[in-house]
Design a protein with these regions (language model features):
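Flexible loop/turn segments at secondary-structure boundaries
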Residues: 58-61, 83, 102, 147-148, ...
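Active-site loop/helix belt of alpha/beta enzymes
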Residues: 144-291
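Short acidic, glycine/serine/threonine-rich loops at helix termini
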Residues: 63, 85-86, 106-108, 127-130, ...
């Protein structure tokens, strides 16, 4: 299967006349269509709600789009909670799924109406100390340990993950929480990452639904919701088939009716915390070829680097690359496509067969809409790029400006050296 950019070269040329590369570009049309499809796929469940994983793409303008389709926010830090509040999230719109959590963050999450999802049984004491009480609605994260298997092999290894409670711990936690005043409970689990199969959610649902039945029977706790979290992936490689959210939703419905409904639990709401699935394919990193180097290998240097997209350097992750305007030319040149960091792993592609690339060519690096800009950093003094939203009508706007040296040096603003650091700022613009 061929990966097609959601933007044309003509439109990119128009955008780059106003905004210099590199930048992250987002597709409003794709985001909306996908959010609508998710909502329709789970419309059978009256209480269904998607809590978008803010960590994946922390931009309020993009979150605003998802809110139009009923999405809330899944937060894991104080600043993500602040963003959720700023975009208008109300009580019940925020899921606080954190770990190793400072008490002040539990307090803030509760103050703004967030549902606290406990990662560990010891956090019961932390929450009670922070709030002076146990919230009436609370959730616990489950980790069954071992490996999580599916029809096409091992999906992931929860036993090695730092997250969640054991089976024994979650039963004890429910009993303790109930005795301390909790009235409605949720359970949460994240057992595999970036799964490209329609079977993952239904299989996870079976595990969670069966656990919910046992928890309600043995502890007397009322299960209000089951949070399937994230894990639905995207096809980074052209030969991968995308997940079908409608098939996934129907698969979860079938298990729901087989396990929960016969136990009188047909009122349990299904929650999700999708990030990559919601945004990944609808963002790309646009960069320009600025150098070519011919040594022991053929290198193309671009004006983006791992600061703009860390995944290839950090995980060896594959991101497809389109050389704009040369989509139909033969891929008969083998390149390493590199950034300028003083690290040899700053490579967007290694030994990648691509059309001949000339200096000045625009390259689109696909599927950066989640865990792209969000994982940026400032090593080597590099500055993070702008974010641009391409609207359905073809217009575009900046939704985050690029960093400047003033941003980079901002934490020195209380010292005399601050003005010296910026004395050449105007000359470098």
């Amino acid at each position: 299967m061929k990966k097609e950019p959601f933007v044309t070269l003509k439109k990119l040329n128009e955008i780059t006349e106003k905004f210099p590369t590199p930048f992250h570009l987002y597709d409003e049309k794709g985001i909306r269509e996908n959010a609508k499809a998710l909502k329709e796929a789970f419309a059978w469940n009256k209480g269904f709600k998607e809590f978008f994983a803010v960590k994946a793409t922390p931009n309020p303008y993009l979150i605003n789009i998802l809110q139009e389709y009923g999405c809330g926010c899944d937060c894991s830090s104080e600043t993500e909670l602040m963003m959720a509040k700023a975009v208008g999230c109300k009580k019940g719109d925020i899921m606080f799924s954190s770990n190793d959590t400072p008490e002040k963050e539990f307090r803030y999450a509760d103050e703004i109406g967030g549902i606290i999802n406990l990662d560990d049984i010891t956090h019961i004491e932390s929450v009670e100390k922070a709030l002076g009480k146990i919230p009436e609605v609370i959730s616990c994260r489950y980790n069954p340990g071992g490996v999580f298997k599916i029809s096409n092999g091992i999906m992931d290894n929860p036993g090695d993950a730092k997250y969640g409670m054991t089976t024994e711990q979650i039963f004890d936690a429910f009993r303790i929480l109930k005795s301390k005043g909790a009235k409605e409970f949720g359970i949460h689990a994240f057992l595999a990452s970036n799964t490209v199969t329609n079977d993952y959610y239904p299989m996870l649902a079976k595990v969670m639904f069966e656990l919910a039945v046992k928890l309600q029977k043995e502890t007397g706790a009322h299960i209000k919701f089951i949070n399937l979290s994230g894990g639905i992936g995207i096809p980074y490689k052209p030969d991968q088939e995308p997940n079908d959210i409608r098939v996934i939703g129907e698969g979860v419905r079938k298990v729901y009716e087989e396990v929960l409904v016969p136990e009188g639990m047909g009122d349990v709401a299904i929650y999700t915390e999708l990030g990559r699935f919601m945004m990944g394919p609808y963002g790309c990193l646009v960069t320009k070829a600025i150098h070519e180097k011919h040594t022991h290998k053929e290198y193309i240097g671009v004006d983006a680097c791992a600061v703009n997209l860390m995944r290839p350097a950090m995980y060896g992750a594959y991101h497809h690359i389109t050389v704009m305007g040369k989509e139909n030319e033969p891929c008969d040149h083998k390149y390493d496509v590199t950034g300028s960091l003083c690290e040899n792993n700053d490579k967007f592609a290694i030994d990648r067969m691509l059309p001949k690339i000339d200096k000045g060519d625009l390259l689109v690096i696909h599927d950066t809409g989640a865990h792209g800009f969000a994982m940026g950093y400032n090593y080597n003094g590099k500055l993070k790029s702008a974010e641009i939203l391409l609207h359905e009508d073809g217009s575009f706007e900046m939704i985050r400006r690029a960093e400047t040296p003033r941003d980079y040096f901002a934490t020195f603003d209380c010292f005399p050296v601050f003005e010296k650091l910026l004395q050449d700022e105007d000359e470098l613009k």
